[in-house]
């Protein structure tokens, strides 16, 4: 099950179909994996607070992933995205908010499934998987030079 919680009006004001975009991207990233995921569309302040508490980084970011303990199955974990940060990234990178949100949800869910980008080899593998999933969703390659790329700070 994919649960979408929207705690920032910015998301639905800018993208009325935000919940549907999230659900579609999360399902695509899960593929055949069984389990529950919660995706929180939040304000940057909430993301900054979580980033400070769990990663000791006192700043907002685009997406945070919090994998659940194996004993919590079927809950796989939570993904949190900050509206203003994501919207600014999308604009800077010349992407629609819908496409950027799809990418960040796929990225976050892959972290819940154990994917990472701590070194170049892991990053290349994870990015290739993201490209494949996003292509199935009709979203352009987010890592193409003209599209920019998401910030890689490591998984949370």
Task: Label each PLM-derived region with a short phrase.
Residues 1-101, 112-156:
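An acidic/histidine-cluster motif and surrounding catalytic segment
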Residues 104:
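Extended, folded domain segments that form the structural surfaces/walls around functional sites
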